[in-house]
A protein has these predicted regions:
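N-terminal secretory signal peptides that target proteins for export/translocation
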Residues: 1-6
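Bacterial N-terminal signal peptides
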Residues: 10-20
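Sec/Tat signal peptide C-region and signal peptidase I cleavage site
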Residues: 21-28
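Short N-proximal segments of mature Sec-exported proteins
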Residues: 29-95
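Short, compact, well-ordered microdomains
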Residues: 92-125
């Protein structure tokens, strides 16, 4: 077996350490205001993509909520039976809340979908 020179091993460890401690920039998801602005200025085809994104975000949250309900845990929100929203309905739900509460516009859109669902379908015990 070939031995790795100590200098190369030291260089690899140093490079890895630099990568771990160097500041990195992560791209967070759009906030509601930005997402709606991008949606509104998009072409017809791009709007359909955004509607899929918003609808799939809601769908994922709905599946997570279904698991909580099925396992008898506290649900995130309490929708009616056979609940389903389309992408355009999610867009309008976000738009309504953003226009009534300007602070809501600064919330990441994925989290905002959950908050809007909780507001629209609160759990009352």
């Amino acid at each position: 077996m070939r031995k790795i020179p100590r200098i190369w091993l030291s260089a690899a460890v140093a490079s890895a350490a630099i990568c771990l401690i160097a500041p990195t920039t992560a791209k967070a998801e759009y906030d509601v205001k930005t997402a709606l602005r991008v949606y509104d200025s998009a072409t017809s085809n791009d709007r359909k993509i955004w509607e899929l994104i918003f609808g799939n975000t809601q769908n994922g949250i709905n599946w997570a909520n279904s698991v909580l309900i099925r396992t008898k845990q506290q649900p995130l929100y309490c929708p009616p039976d056979d609940f389903s929203l389309t992408g355009p309905q999610v867009v309008e739900m976000l738009r309504e809340w953003a226009s009534s509460d300007p602070k809501f516009g600064g919330v990441p859109y994925g989290f905002a979908v959950l908050l809007a669902l909780q507001k629209k379908f609160p759990c009352t015990d």
